[in-house]
Amino acid sequence: MLKKLLFGSALLLTAGLQAQSYYYISSMRAGNPGGLNTENDQQSDASGGGWTKLIGQAANPVYTNKVAIPFAFEFAGNAVTHLKAATSGYITFDTGATATPITGPAALPSASLPDRSVSIWGMSASGSNDGIFTKTFGTAGKRQFWIKFFSMSTPGDAGNSWTYASVVLEEGTNNIYIVIQNCLQANNAYVSPKHALGIQINSSTASSVKGSPNITNQLSDAVPEDNDFYQFIYGNQPTRDAAVLSHNVPNYLSRTAPLTIKARVRNQGSAEINNLTLNYSINGGAPVTASVSGLTLGNNDINELTHTTPWLPAASGWANVMVWTSNPNGGADETPANDTVKARIYVYDSAAPRKVMHEVFSSSTCPPCRPGNVALAAIFDARPGTHCILKYQCDFPGTGDPYYTTEVGTKRSFYAVNSVPATVRDGLPGVNPNGGYSIDDYDGLQAKPSFARLKINTAQLSWKGKVDFNVTITPLEDYMTGSNWRLMAAISEKTTFRNVETNGETEFHHVMKKMVPSPNGTVLSNLQKGVPQSFDLSYTFPDKYRLPNTSADRINLATETTVEDFWDLEVVVFLQNNATKE
C-alpha cells in the first residue's frame, strides 16, 4: 500500500510539472518593458545606435542566419543559446528548422510554425526599407536582447502599411516580451495588419494572446511611451493575483482638499476577481480599508477602484502614501509583491500660480528648428502671461549658430541635450516641439503649484552696457530645503536679426546673451517659509560687438558681445534645484 501511495504522489508531481506553460500579462500604452529601451521606435542600424542588421528586403519568406543570445537564457525551462528569425514575423529557438516560413498568420498552436517559437506572425519583408535587427540593452545581469521587425510590410497591402514590433528576451527572469511599437499608413488604402501573438512550445502547446490570429495594431506615434507589450512568464499562473498598477495620488496636494484615493488594478490571476479589499496608509499609520464587491475582473482585465474614505491631510509637509489591495475573492493574494504602490508627496498650505520656464535649444542652421519655434509660439500665444522663455542658440548642426557661446554649451551639457530643437520645460528632459509638446502638456505643467514668489523689483540699463537688477524670493512653504537650490538669472535679447544662416528663419526671439553671474546661478541657503530674501545682480557687457563667422568662431564673453540693441534686452529669473533640475 505504501509503494502504491508513493507511486501515486509521483504521478501527481509529474502531472504538476507537465502542467507548466507560458501565461501572459498585457500592458497597453505602457511604454517598453523595464524602461531599458528609450529609443525612438524607428531606430535601426541606418540611424545608428548599435543595432545589428540580420536581414533586409526579401521577396519571399525566409529565415535569417542563427544568432547567439548574449546571455544565459531558458525557454520553457530549458537552456537555449541561439535563435533565428523569420521575415513572416516570428523567432524560433529551433535553429535546425528548415521548412520555408509561410506568411500566415494562423491560430496557435499551428503545425506551420516551428517548435519553440515566439510569434508576431503576419508580416513580410517585401518593402525596400523592411528588415530585422538586434540590439542588447542594459547591464550584465539585467540585460534585454531585442529582435526588432523593422518597417515590416503587411501581406496583401505592399506599399501602404508597415509595422514596427519586437521580441524581447530578458536576462535573469527568462521572461519573453512581445512589444508592438509603431504602425504606419501611406494612404487611405491602408489595411490593418493582423497578427498571431504568442508563444508556441510545440504543435500542440501554445500560449496565445486573446484575439489571435486577428489582432490588429492601432496607429501610434514612433515614441516608446504609447507602446503595447505582452509579458510571457513560464510557470503555473497564480489563481488569485490582483496587481496594483497605479494610483491617483498627486505629487502635490492642498491640505484643505480631501482626496478620494483610486487605484488601477489588473487581474493577473487565472480566476475572475469578484471582490477584494482596497487599502491605504499615510506615513506608516493604521490602514484605512474599504471592501470592493460586484467586480467581474477577468484575466488581464483592468479596472479603476475607488476607496470610500477620502484622505484629508492633518498637516502640511512631506507625506508617504501607500496604496494596496488584499484578499481577492476572500483569499490570500498569491503574488503579494505586486499588490502595493507608494508615493512621497508634498502637502501644502499655500501656493502661487506657476509660470512655466521654457529653455529652448535651437540653431539657425537647424531646418526643423524653424517649424519647432513656430509650434512653440502658437502655444505661448494661446497662454499669455503664464510662461518665461530663454533660447540657447547651439553650435550644430553644420557650422552652427554664430550666437553660440560657451555658456550655451554648459547649459546643453547640464540638460544632456544631444539634438535640436529641444525644449526643456521646468527642468524636465528636452522634447522636440515638432509634435513632442502640446497645449495639454503645457497646461499640465502650469497646473503644478509653485511654493515661492519670485519678483524682479528693478531692472536698469546704463548707457555703458551695465544691467542692474534686484530680485526677491519669498518662500511660501518649507519646501526648498537643502543646498541644491539656485537662483538662475539671464539677460536675453528680445529679437535678433544678424545670426541668420540656412534654416529660413530671419529673426530670433529671447536669445540668451549672458547668464548672471554664470550658468551655475547663485547658491541659495536658509530659505524659510514666509521670509523674503533679496538679491542684487549685475553684469556689464563689453562695448565691442562682433558677429562670428561660425559657432566655432564664437565670441570671447570677457571682451566681446553679440548684443544687437541694448534697449531690447530683458531679464529672466527662475528657481532651480541643481540635483533634480526642477
Regions found by a protein language model. Give the residues of each.
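Extracytoplasmic Ser/Thr/Pro-rich, glycosylation-prone low-complexity segments
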Residues: 19-240, 412-413
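Intrinsically disordered, low-complexity Pro/Gly/Ser/Thr-rich segments with frequent PxxP/GP/PP motifs
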Residues: 285-314, 528-529
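Short, conserved sequence motifs used for protein processing/export or organelle targeting and
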Residues: 385-582
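Local sequence-structure signature of Cys/Sec-based thiol-disulfide redox active-site neighborhoods
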Residues: 350-387, 392
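Short, solvent-exposed loop/linker segments at the N-terminal edge
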Residues: 251-258, 461-465
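Proline/serine/threonine-rich low-complexity linkers at boundaries of modular beta-sandwich domains
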Residues: 234-243, 443-451
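Bacterial Sec-dependent N-terminal signal peptides
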Residues: 1-23, 237-239
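Enriched for extracellular/lumenal, surface-exposed ectodomains of secreted and cell-surface proteins
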Residues: 282, 320-337, 575-577
